[in-house]
UniProtKB/Swiss-Prot annotation:
The keyword Zinc does not apply. The gene is norV. It comes from Shigella boydii serotype 4 (strain Sb227). Residues 423-474 form the Rubredoxin-like domain. This is Anaerobic nitric oxide reductase flavorubredoxin. In the N-terminal section; belongs to the zinc metallo-hydrolase group 3 family. Anaerobic nitric oxide reductase; uses NADH to detoxify nitric oxide (NO), protecting several 4Fe-4S NO-sensitive enzymes. Has at least 2 reductase partners, only one of which (NorW, flavorubredoxin reductase) has been identified. NO probably binds to the di-iron center; electrons enter from the NorW at rubredoxin and are transferred sequentially to the FMN center and the di-iron center. Also able to function as an aerobic oxygen reductase. FMN binds at residues 260-264, 342-369. It is found in: Cytoplasm.
Length: 479
């Protein structure tokens, strides 16, 4: 089934609702994807790109329903990767002499995948044109390393449509083709996820290339991407976002991610987050256990953040494998304008945190002090973690801290007598979580100021879910 894009331009691509892994397992496509191919019918008929190789036969069959394959005058390949040019072998078996227009680097890539050097390749460079009749031309723009050396974009005059290749796309599958027809929150999330995980390493190239394209002073009524939606409603909004994201992007956000063997590093992460939130309530703090989280969501949050705290237990004197792998991906993504700190628990040796700090520095992060805890952190160690979070919040603040948090220590000291009147704090003997009467436990409707004696009998420890009977008076407060 084809979809009219504009005038004589039809979408003849393929939706892929089922795909969940892209580039091996490097990118999780939780909302599927699409492989966008476009058929232009003017005096000359032009096919722009094909689809992923696994849909080759379906693609050629569907294309034959749209047009006699022999009537295709030109094939344009903006990118030789298999999700763009994968159906070429199946198609060229039917029309072997059809001219293929692509960059010089694309010929190498296409031959590397399809092994047909006899195909009728025609090399194009930035500014080259191809007349397709009815007063319209294709204008080619090379975009090397966005995100392969062979990449280019193609602009159709008259209709003012930019076929943008991977740029401005998203791995997002929907029955609707146009940006104004889909859920805007989902669309924005997938656009940012796509940029953060795929195009971030090339941010230094994005701005000059967009500036070069804008310098042609060509109107852009639509941007037809290789994946996801076609931008027809205010199409340059995504261009503006790319310029913003390419400029060492950061929000007032801190991402904490960790892996843990015995829950100890998780306890540290929670306490650090508490310290950050106490000191700078404006900052968004996001916490992820890498063993239970989508790594591309973690990386998207790192992209958005001003800084990242990475935690690992020590195993065989090195960091946990999932942490090592994710930090390696962060190195490849080449994040800029971000700070980092390493933390973690250990037993008889603590080599992981030092190795992690070195790896983060090698990845281009501006490093802050690291933090270590031996075995399961007790109340004193957790307070050190909270203080570490407070110091991180102060060092990484993008603006002067709110006066209310600056004065918080003084207020806490003046309220010490009142807190003491509420009775002792109680500690879970299993996981060491502490109930503070002054704070209560809002998640279980236990209001601040509730003494332990008035806490309902059905109360459960928020950390290990055991009941009140495992709690003991905090040793430092026992009489």
């Amino acid at each position: 089934m084809s979809i009219v894009v504009k005038n004589n331009i039809h979408w003849v691509g393929q939706r892929d609702w089922e795909v969940r892994d892209f580039h091996g397992t490097e990118y999780k496509t939780l909302r599927g994807s699409s492989y966008n191919s476009y058929l232009i019918r003017e005096e000359k008929n032009v096919l722009i790109d094909t689809v992923d190789h696994k849909f080759s036969r379906e693609f050629v069959q569907n294309l034959r329903n749209e047009i006699d394959l022999a009537d295709i005058d030109y094939i344009v390949i903006n990118h030789a990767e298999e999700d763009h040019a994968g159906a070429l072998t199946e198609l060229m078996a039917q029309i072997p002499d059809t001219p293929i227009y692509c960059t010089a680097n694309a010929i190498d890539s296409i031959n590397g995948h399809h092994h047909h050097p006899e195909w009728n390749f025609n090399v194009v460079k930035t500014g080259d044109t191809l007349d397709i009749g009815n007063g319209k031309q294709l204008i080619f723009v090379e975009t090397p390393m966005l995100h392969w050396p062979d990449s280019m974009m193609t602009y159709l005059t008259g209709d003012a449509v930019l076929f943008s290749n991977d740029a401005f796309g998203q791995h997002y599958c929907d029955e609707h083709l146009f940006n104004d027809e889909v859920d805007q929150t989902e669309l924005f999330e997938q656009c940012q996820r796509y940029y953060a995980n795929i195009l971030t390493p090339f941010s230094r190239l994005v701005t000059p290339k967009i500036t070069e394209i804008l310098g042609f002073n060509l109107p852009v009524d639509m941007i037809a991407t290789s994946h996801g939606v076609v931008w027809r409603d205010n199409p340059t909004q995504i261009v503006e976002l790319y310029l913003k994201w390419a400029a060492d992007y950061q929000e007032d956000r801190i991402t904490i991610f960790y892996d843990t063997m015995s829950n100890n590093t998780r306890m540290m992460a929670d306490a650090i987050a508490q310290g950050i939130a106490e000191t700078d309530p404006r900052v968004a703090v996001k916490i992820f256990n890498v063993a239970r989280s989508d790594k591309n969501e973690i990386l998207t949050n790192v992209f958005r953040s001003k800084g990242v705290l990475v935690g690992t237990s020590t195993m065989n004197n090195v960091m946990m494998p999932k942490i090592a792998g994710l930090v390696e991906e962060m190195t490849g993504l080449r994040f800029r304008n971000k700070r980092a700190s390493a933390f973690g628990s250990h037993g008889w040796s603590g080599g992981a945190v030092d190795r992690l700090s070195t790896r983060l520095q090698d990845a281009g992060f501006e490093m802050s002090l690291s933090l270590k805890a031996k075995w399961r952190p007790d109340q004193d160690a957790l307070e050190l973690c909270r203080e570490h979070g407070r110091e991180i919040a102060r060092q990484w603040a993008l603006a002067p801290l709110p006066q209310s948090t600056v004065n918080k220590v003084v207020k806490e000291e003046t309220s010490a007598t009142t807190t003491a009147d509420l009775g002792p704090r109680m500690q879970c003997s299993v996981c060491q979580w502490i109930y503070d009467p002054a704070k209560g436990e809002p998640m279980q409707d236990v209001a601040p100021g509730t003494p332990w004696s008035e806490v309902p009998d059905n109360f459960l420890c928020p950390e290990c879910s055991l009941g009140k009977d495992v709690f003991e008076e905090l040793a430092s407060e026992a009489k």
